UniProtKB/Swiss-Prot annotation:
NCBIfam families: hip, PRK00199.1. One of its GO terms (molecular function) is DNA binding. CDD domains: IHF_B. PROSITE patterns: HISTONE_LIKE (PS00045). Belongs to the bacterial histone-like protein family. It comes from Yersinia enterocolitica serotype O:8 / biotype 1B (strain NCTC 13174 / 8081). This is Integration host factor subunit beta. Keywords: DNA recombination, DNA-binding, Transcription, Transcription regulation, Translation regulation. Gene3D superfamilies: IHF-like DNA-binding proteins (4.10.520.10). One of its GO terms (biological process) is regulation of DNA-templated transcription.
């Protein structure tokens, strides 16, 4: 599901709320979450999961075109850990 599809689905479920308001709310929520992670804070949504940053240590990589070794710096990457309720709901096919 894309962000646009999410907005359409939410707007369809909340017919009394204009689509533009739903779009603004979704965009604001995602922007706030990204900003919170950028500040190094963890986000926990009970029953859904938690978002945090994981550190990737510096390493030697390779340029895929030339095969030359490239030094890659350490960096923080976003990480999502699903909550138990989400894992259980997603496991209906397993």
């Amino acid at each position: 599901m894309t962000k646009s599809e999410l907005i359409e689905r939410l707007a369809g479920q909340q017919s009394h709320v204009p689509t533009k308001v739903v779009e603004d709310a979704v965009k604001e929520m995602l922007e706030h979450m990204a900003g919170t992670l950028a500040e190094g804070e963890r986000i926990e949504i009970r029953g859904f999961g938690s978002f945090s940053l994981h550190y990737r240590a510096p390493r030697v990589g390779r340029n895929p075109k030339t095969g030359a070794k490239v030094e890659l710096e350490g960096k923080y990457v976003p990480h999502f850990k699903p909550g138990k309720e989400l894992r259980d709901r997603a496991n209906i096919y397993g």
